[in-house]
Amino acid sequence: MLSDGIKCVGVVVKPNHEEARQTACELSEWLEKRGIALIGKPHEEAEICEIEEAGTEEFKEKADLIVVLGGDGTMISTARLTGSREILVLGINYGSLGYLTEFRIEEMFAALEEILAGNYETDRRVMLEVEHWRGNEKLASGRVLNDVVINKAVLARIIEIKVELNNQFVNDFRADGLIVATPTGSTAYSLSAGGPIVYPSMNAIILTPICPFTLTNRPIVIPDNAEINLRLKNESDGVVLTLDGQIGYQMQVGDCVRIRKSPTTFNLVQPPNRNYFDVLRNKLKWGR
């Protein structure tokens, strides 16, 4: 089990949130009594209650469990910290949405006791690996939990994106942009752009055009073992590639974005007696 031999816990705290910072102090004391170390990133969580500092690489290597005190944005940034390791993640909701941070603060210590005892369920979320190429030069790479987005600046004209799956031509999308989303990301930007809600455990990826020029260019659901190539076909100022809405890169005509399923998953502790549709009904206010 992922919880076997937890000796070190990493903490990620929502920036500038005093209540979350105070909870991190309480967590530090709770773990210390049980002989478990707590680490945080330098100049961030490590400034709270003298929590031990750990650089990004050290954080990835040492943490056996990550506790996230924040909202979905904090959780998404945490996904980049797990690297290629199968690290267990416990999300405590201090944000406004909480699709991913499903535990309430009053449930945290009871959840930790269950994790240490090995009594928990894991929700394994698909992640995508992304590469940005210009000719034969790889400009950037990363991993996303929610989505990869190519879109235009406010005043830029419509962009044209060539889409290939496993080197087979699919379509030239003429639109304000294109979203490539995981099932986790299906309730984020893709949903706002008219994409479907996809159950988190489905082996699928969603391609959702943003304000397509042709109304018949609809969202497409594809198997997650497909390799996706996106190529910007026309000149347009201000076209940006965005990873999980948090990291952005400028694109030029001819640039290619390669996307494939990551071999590692993002492993969330699942609350007992609570399911995905409970979350959807609450967050999307179904029936109200």
Task: Label the model's feature ranges.
Residues 66, 89, 178-179:
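Short, well-ordered beta-strand core segments
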Residues 171-216:
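Gly/Ser/Thr-rich active-site loops/lids in small-molecule metabolic enzymes
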Residues 97-176:
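Catalytic core of DAGKc-family lipid kinases
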Residues 11, 68, 180:
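Redox-cofactor binding/interface segments in oxidoreductases and associated redox assembly factors
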Residues 150, 166-169, 215-288:
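ATP/nucleoside-binding phosphotransfer catalytic cores, i.e., glycine-rich phosphate-binding loops
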